[in-house]
């Protein structure tokens, strides 16, 4: 028996079937490093339109988690796809390096009593160490960026730039000093930004407190009574008993109706709508004596329950009827609404009582409770109220309450003297920061679109921004305040520039070690040098200033604005927010043109990642066991607009999809063995119809892929490319061309035609997957035939396609119909195989009974229809000629009959043909194979 294997064009490639990503990816990283890929991209990008994705800096503390990986991979997919689209898309990674978590870590290690300058030195060293660890992990993910020169907010140039940004805002009239209630953490010993507050359930003491009337005659008159015959008082409800010692007013709504209720031994003032519920809660019976609108109660005084002072009634629109009594007790030092209400009635800062110190302990001079921690004082205050007969009800409730995001401990509002960025104070051009920011939001593209309403609502309702902190490790607020007037030095902006120049040389230590006389000369004795540092959200929120036009100028031809900021959905109140405010203050517009938001990672059951639940998946584990490309493929396949579910099972599905894409690429490479595009590539008009369709289909897909990348819908790219590999290629085209590829003469038009198509598809496919499967695309690139440069990323989208011309008989619609017919035939072939009626498909002969229009189209393929259906014979007959045993199909106007071939199997092509053995020199093979071996070769036109 002759061995015809040597006469076949069998696939051959060194491209490995087994990916071995954990071992092979580090080799690719070394390749990128050795060729200086990032530098080369900047060189070839000169003169191109820029696309700037500005990196929101992760905090330099701890290992990266899966959320960090998602964020960086999304950014990398955008930067890579924009590069392939012909943009110059630099990516400068950054880190947020100042702030309390690092300071807390250093204090935990070295103690709290070390000198401030040593604390800062150790914080800087710790942050630098953390940056290096995170950097290695990000690089391992395949993220392409300027890793040799990232930005760090603690770099001297950035610290100086931040001071200059603050100076711009001072110059614009946005910065002021004020006493206001701010979020305060006792454990931090500092004010917190809104983004540092999280809400958890907390058990609290809920109390109803009686304030005896001080102006009895006025109260009687307000209710139209001649006099009060019994002791009377107003009732408040609160969940913060610790604020009662600081009570200074009582708030009612001007439009609500209030009732004076006779309860036997005394009269209670309550909102009329809540009387029934309150009396039931107190276990009392009562009768309404009279009613009055809230506005009639204005300025009537009531006595504090246990201190010798009065609390007047103020009118306030924020009072509600959803809980309590309809009257709100007001402690202006400990509530934003309380503070605003009391200030509106003329209370000066000096008159505001603030007995709680920064550590949560009452001042020693406070009667009854001095020296007590407020949470521990709560039961003592409740007991005191009961003792003086002013406690009507006490119960414990569970409610959502603000906590520190670091310490997980309850926060309070606390009025302290702080530096603020004013939201509503008029700037020098007559606009407010709030107006500027809201206008900027309207000019910003949001992905997903709902982000616009979310950020708009936050800006519209937010208070002034407290930017000062009482910590060591932070960029200083370099102000000098006059000792008598408390005013800023008249040359503040000029002095800040001098400080910035010094910080540029020696870092923030230049300010902390500065002798004021060096800058102020003889004036130094008249001024205090303040010690406050800036909120870390100001650090990151001004990177558009101190990075994009400072340490790493982006040279954007459309001004100092990023095209895109991309972060998690929590950054609407974080980095997106602070950047918007500083950009609007300094430049009058947002520092970004677009905002992309991604959701948080959860497990397959929708639960948050938690060590206690055991569902945490570290990105390092994935890269070590499966490879970064599997993680990248999962990110691309997931709709990031909502929660992103990840688990080992989900990642395994991504690995399965990866194998299908890799196997498709390997098939293309193996069948391009010996193909030199410089001399073997056929012009489109010389290619077979099926091959022209395959190239045209790839062209259409590329247009869809480009559009999906441009709109950041990576899951669409994944779905379309994966489906193309599995369905159009694996399930149709590549299956059909195997016969022609393997059995036709090596240099025949028939074979070179399908190789030309596979070459075009391979050149395109490697680019489509490059933003997603960064490592695998680079590996494929090295194996593709023809001369090529050092990296797939040094190229743009493939341009070598030829579109099917108009009027082409075997057009797109034709091949769509053929695919449907082939699917119907495959279904019946499978049924016949399962019934043991045939062995393989090539043992089958098929007759297609088709309605005239379909029959006419299928007839265009002539004898080559059998190659498309991958059967040994195929005929087309009229639908009316179909016998009773012909099978109906899902294709309208088509019935099928499959029979087992009676002919001998060709030992070379495996087709069952009547001419096998007719050539005495080749008794085991068919006439077609004889022609392909020793003749001029068969001629194919279509498939």
UniProtKB/Swiss-Prot annotation:
ATP binds at residue 611. Keywords: Aminoacyl-tRNA synthetase, ATP-binding, Cytoplasm, Ligase, Metal-binding, Nucleotide-binding, Protein biosynthesis, Zinc. A motif ('HIGH' region) lies at residues 58-68. PROSITE patterns: AA_TRNA_LIGASE_I. Its cofactor is Zn(2+). GO terms for molecular function: aminoacyl-tRNA deacylase activity; ATP binding; isoleucine-tRNA ligase activity; tRNA binding; zinc ion binding. It catalyses: tRNA(Ile) + L-isoleucine + ATP = L-isoleucyl-tRNA(Ile) + AMP + diphosphate. InterPro entries: aa-tRNA-synth_I_CS, aa-tRNA-synth_Ia, Anticodon_Ile_BEm, Ile-tRNA-ligase, Ile-tRNA-ligase_type1, Ile-tRNA_ligase, M/V/L/I-tRNA-synth_anticd-bd, Rossmann-like_a/b/a_fold. It is found in: Cytoplasm. Its EC number is 6.1.1.5. GO terms for cellular component: cytosol. GO terms for biological process: isoleucyl-tRNA aminoacylation. CDD domains: Anticodon_Ia_Ile_BEm (cd07960), IleRS_core (cd00818). It is an enzyme of class 6 (ligase). NCBIfam families: ileS (TIGR00392). Monomer. This is Isoleucine--tRNA ligase.
